[in-house]
Amino acid sequence: MTQEFAVTTPETTQTVGTARVKRGMAEMLKGGVIMDVVTPEQAKIAEDAGAVAVMALERVPADIRAQGGVSRMSDPDMIDGIINAVSIPVMAKARIGHFVEAQILQSLGVDYIDESEVLTPADYTNHIDKWQFTVPFVCGATNLGEALRRITEGAAMIRSKGEAGTGDVSNATTHMRKIRQEIRKLAALPEDELYVAAKELQAPYELVREVAETGKLPVVLFTAGGIATPADAAMMMQLGAEGVFVGSGIFKSGNPAQRAEAIVKATTFYDDPDVLAKVSRGLGEAMVGINVEEIPQPHRLAERGW
């Protein structure tokens, strides 16, 4: 079998990655933890704790939420510092719809780009055309329709959104359960009803039929938003996540290095209560957090994207 790496489009002579390679790169992260870091020192702590990748950004979601204002792509020097500090893959965030930020991140050599609702959207109508890039993209989703639309645009990994920067896992569970529930519902439909389902999901029929036949997304499904403890990570894995993003929950806690290692172990041994109890001991204070229900609707980050 021939291996695909990239293709050059004749119209532009631009090299773009194939879906097989992009999705394969995301597959390599399955079962792991991806941690938000703001300094090279934090990146090293994450790597030493067993993170499969780090997300380089100037402010963790809790600080973005607290400080307000317009949140944009991180400074290239800061991203370079983290890339040079670790040997594991480095992700970075671009604003929804901001294809030039994505072009810059690709030029910097990041391994993955997160088109993220945590940053202030640059376009309230269009997401980035992710097929035009060699680097794979990860995108958030709160339901199956949103996930399928992002995959149609070229996303190689989906993460259920949750509510970033809160330390409240409730929205993460809601979104993961909803995506999984909608997949099961789709798989139970007779084939002639998939056309209507595709219309309702606002997604291509061929992609809807593939999900119905396989019972899963064609890309990796991680979870994110509000995961602050080993138990949170393990619960999300038991609910069907294939890996975990942890943002503010580690470096806003009392003992980041120990908590990072504990969350990695909990993600690996998510179905072993004895291991979970052991790694949950003596972690110190978790991030204080915010109850999602107390956040006004306009300030909920998960509402961004469509």
UniProtKB/Swiss-Prot annotation:
One of the protein's GO biological processes: amino acid metabolic process
CDD domains: pdxS
Reactions catalysed: aldehydo-D-ribose 5-phosphate + D-glyceraldehyde 3-phosphate + L-glutamine = pyridoxal 5'-phosphate + L-glutamate + phosphate + 3 H2O + H(+)
Keyword Lyase: yes
Pathway(s) annotated for this protein in UniProt: Cofactor biosynthesis; pyridoxal 5'-phosphate biosynthesis
Enzyme Commission identifier(s): 4.3.3.6
Residues that coordinate or bind D-ribose 5-phosphate: 36, 165, 226, 247-248
Signal peptide boundaries: none
Catalytic residues as annotated in Swiss-Prot or TrEMBL: 93 (schiff-base intermediate with d-ribose 5-phosphate)
SUPFAM superfamilies listed in its UniProt record: Ribulose-phoshate binding barrel (SSF51366)
Assembly and interaction partners: In the presence of PdxT, forms a dodecamer of heterodimers.
Described purpose of this protein according to its UniProt entry: Catalyzes the formation of pyridoxal 5'-phosphate from ribose 5-phosphate (RBP), glyceraldehyde 3-phosphate (G3P) and ammonia. The ammonia is provided by the PdxT subunit. Can also use ribulose 5-phosphate and dihydroxyacetone phosphate as substrates, resulting from enzyme-catalyzed isomerization of RBP and G3P, respectively.
Entry similarity comment: Belongs to the PdxS/SNZ family.
Name the record gives this protein: Pyridoxal 5'-phosphate synthase subunit PdxS
Organism: Nocardia farcinica (strain IFM 10152)
Name of the gene: pdxS
